[in-house]
Amino acid sequence: MFSLFHHPQLRPRHYAGGVVVISFIILFYGGALSSIFALGGELQWRAWFTDDYLQHLILFSFGQALLSTVLSIFFGLLLARALFYKPFLGKKWLLKLMSLTFVLPALVVIFGLIGIYGSSGWLAWLANLFGMSWQGHIYGLSGILIAHLFFNIPLAAQLFLQSLQSIPYQQRQLAAQLNLQGWQFVKLVEWPVFRQQCLPTFSLIFMLCFTSFTVVLTLGGGPQYTTLETAIYQAILFEFDLPKAALFAMLQFVFCLILFSLTSRFSLSNQNGLSNSNIWFEKPKSAVKIFHILVLLVFVFFLFSPVLNILISALSSSNLLTVWHNSQLWRALGYSLSIAPLSALLALTMAIALLLLSRRLEWLHYQKISQFIINAGMVILAIPILVLAMGLFLLLQDRDFSNIDLFIIVVFCNALSAMPFVLRILSAPFHNNMRYYENLCNSLGIVGWQRFYLIEWKTLRAPLRYAFALGLALSLGDFTAIALFGNQEFTSLPHLLYQQLGNYRNQDAAVTAGILLLLCGILFAFIHTYRDADDLSK
C-alpha cells in the first residue's frame, strides 16, 4: 500500500489533505472509543446482561424502531401512489416541501406536534368543540411514533415515487392491453420495483429510528420508553454513573456498526437502471381517485399542521416582544450562528480532502482503497454522535473546560455528523470531473487552483453551495452534542428550546421554535435554489 505514495501520478497535493483527515478521524474516534472500552472493561458483564432494565432498553430500542419503520414504509407506499397517480395544482411544490422535514430540527417539530396532538392541542380543542371528551396523549410510544412518522413518511414516499417513475411506460401500456387492474396490476407491475426499494429503505429508516435521540428524550415521558441512546445521556447527566453509560455506549456502538454494515450493503439506488421522461399510466377508477385524494389531504394536514402551529404560536406569543430582552436568547442565537457555519465549512473541507484522494485512487484503479476512503468519512453513521460525545466526555473529564473548549468540541462533532451527507452530495460531481477532465488537464498542464477555477468550478459550484447549505441546516438544528456539553453559559437555540420545554415555558419556547423555523426555512429555500441549479447543469 505504501508503494502508492511513490506512484508518478500521485503527488502530495493529491493525498496530503485526505491523509490528514483520515488521521484526524482515526485519532478522534480512537481516543473517544478507547475511553469507553477502558471504562466498560471494568464491568461485571454477566450481571448486566441478566439485568431486566438493560433487556428492556434493548427490546424497546429495537421495537420502537421496527414499528416506526414498518408504519413509515406502509404509509410511504400509499402516499407515493397517490402522488404518482393524482395530478393536482402545486404537486411540484408539495414534493419540494416534503424535503423540509430533512432540515427541520427535531425539537422544533416536537414543539409543533405537541401543539397538535397534546392534551391542549388542536385535536383536543376540536374534540371539545364537538362535545367529545378525547384528550391527546403525545408522550410515550405514541408520541415517538408520530414524530418518527413525520420525518420518515416523506422520505419513504420520495424513494417509492422514484421507483414508480422508473417503470417503463411500455409495461404500463402492455398491462392496460392485458386488462391488468387493481391488485393484479400492483402485484405484477408495481411490486417488483417496490420490492427492490423496500429493503434499502427499510434498513435506512430503521437505522434513523434506532439512533433517534432528541425525539425519544423529549417525548419518551419516562423510563418505560427509553432507548439505549437516551439511557447514555441519563446515566451521565442525571446519575453520573459513568460505567453504566460506558456499557450502554458500547452496546449502541456494536448495534449501530451492524446496522451500518447492513445499510451500506443495501445501498439506495435505482437498481433497474431505468429513468423515464415519458410517464404514462391508465387513469384510475373513481373509487381509487377518491382514496388518493383522502391520502393526500391527510398527509398535507399531518405534514403542515405542526409547522403552521409553530408559526401561529410564535406570532401570538405573549412574550414575542419581551423575549428579545432575554440575554439567554441572544447568547443561544450567537452560538448557533457561529457553530453552524464553522461546522458546515469544516465538514465541506474534510469531505473535499477525502474526495480528492478517493477520486485520484479510483483513477489509478485502486477502487477498494478509494471506497475505503469514502467509508471513513461515513463512519459517523456507524458511531452515533452521542457515543462519540460521551467518549470525549470520559477522555477529557479531568480537564477544566472553558466555553472555547466546548465550542470547538461541538463544532467538530457537528461537522462529523454532517460530513456523510456532504460526501453523498459531492461524491458524484467530483468523480465525474476526474473521469471527464483528467486527460484534458494533463495534456494542457493545468493543475492546482488553476484547474479548479478554469475547469471544475462550473460543475462544482452548485453542489458545493448545496452541500454547504445542507451542512449549515443540519448543524443549526443539531442537539445531540450540545445536550452533553451545553450549560447556561454555553448554549444554542435547540439547547435553549429543550430547556424551555422542560420548564414549561411555552410562550418563550414558541418564539425560540419560530426563530429556528425561520432560519431553517431560509436555508431550505437556499438549498432548493442551488439544488435546482445543480439539476439544470447536469
Swiss-Prot record:
A Pfam short name: BPD_transp_1
Entry membrane topology: Multi-pass membrane protein
Record key words, sorted: Cell inner membrane, Cell membrane, Membrane, Repeat, Transmembrane, Transmembrane helix, Transport
Major location category of this protein: membrane
Domain ABC transmembrane type-1: 58-263, 333-528
Localization: Cell inner membrane
Gene Ontology BP, a term: thiamine transport
GO molecular function, one term: transmembrane transporter activity
Residues annotated as transmembrane: 19-39, 57-77, 97-117, 141-161, 202-222, 242-262, 293-313, 337-357, 376-396, 406-426, 466-486, 509-529
Quaternary structure and partners: The complex is composed of two ATP-binding proteins (ThiQ), two transmembrane proteins (ThiP) and a solute-binding protein (ThiB).
Family per similarity comment: Belongs to the binding-protein-dependent transport system permease family. CysTW subfamily.
This protein's name: Thiamine transport system permease protein ThiP
Organism: Haemophilus influenzae (strain ATCC 51907 / DSM 11121 / KW20 / Rd)
Gene field: thiP
